[in-house]
Amino acid sequence: MQTLVNKIWYQGHPLQWLLLPLSFVFGFITFVRRGLFQLGLKAQTILPVPVIVVGNITVGGSGKTPMVIYLIELLRAHGFNPGVISRGYGANIDGVKQVAYNASATDVGDEPAMIVARSGVPMVVGSKRVEAANVLIAEHGVDVIICDDGLQHYALGRDIELVVIDGQRRLGNEYLLPAGPLREGPWRLKDVDFVVINGGNADVGQFEMQLAPTQVKAVDGNIITTDFDKSQPLVAMAGIGNPTRFFDSLQAQGYQVVLSHGFDDHQAYDKKQLCDLAKDLPLMMTEKDAVKCRDFAQENWWYLAVNAKLSPQFDEQLLSRLHEVVAAKQGNSHGIR
């Protein structure tokens, strides 16, 4: 099913034309919904601290999680105490839940588990993002909220909007769901503060982001190595929005990938499934996949950690905008744009 969806959205499959009427319905619903917030007919909560929303206008992964981790480190380096909120996709969450270090991806979602394992940031997950943010403010004294994947969650007021776009897939066929991958039309990009292109060329006013490999680490956490033998044959797997990007990266770095297998984004794994895939060869995966495999990982299962890299100009503009928000926050209200 996922293969067919990708063909429709990214390869011009003729089924897209049959789905277009449903896309018009979806577009009308989203237009009306956003308009209700703009007109004040639906309530939007304004928080006492700045809110940075990191999202996209497409379905599927685009590199938001590395971007969130980058922002955490950037803000900390400049004296801020950030916290993160997220829906916790794929987890069964009643209300809101604080994400503990080494939390199970089953309990909190794979991306929150990865973010906290990497950064140790205070993080709360749940569908009620305003409630999650208030927990961070009350219990952790955070002075900036980063909302992971909340661009269309208009009940939460925001001060800075940042959209991450996959530099390979871009916006696909540029149709709204279900004929295309778009949650909102391309026009929405004109309203946001920052557009970041992950692994591709940026247009004027946009910023490029590259994912730079750092270390190969054991999934079970027992070994950290920087001298992994790239000459040995291995199997690669990825359950992310664009698995091909990961496989291409391994090939470009000289890894001897004899088999690659892409899973659906947020895929749940079991030991037998992955042992059958690897067949005693080393298994290389993404960091996001690794947090779901820690409990049953074999000693020759590895993941490649990556860091987001952006320009100093991005840092300067983001921090400048944030300082403006901080200065104006007292007594001001920031509505939806």
Swiss-Prot record:
Positions contributing to ATP binding: 58-65
Pfam families: LpxK (PF02606)
Reactions accelerated catalytically: a lipid A disaccharide + ATP = a lipid IVA + ADP + H(+)
Gene Ontology terms: biological process: lipid A biosynthetic process; lipopolysaccharide core region biosynthetic process
Molecular functions per Gene Ontology: ATP binding; tetraacyldisaccharide 4'-kinase activity
Pathway, per record: Glycolipid biosynthesis; lipid IV(A) biosynthesis; lipid IV(A) from (3R)-3-hydroxytetradecanoyl-[acyl-carrier-protein] and UDP-N-acetyl-alpha-D-glucosamine: step 6/6
Catalytic activity, EC: 2.7.1.130
InterPro entries the record matches: LpxK (IPR003758), P-loop_NTPase (IPR027417)
Protein name: Tetraacyldisaccharide 4'-kinase
Taxonomic placement: Bacteria, Pseudomonadati, Pseudomonadota, Gammaproteobacteria, Alteromonadales
Annotated gene: lpxK
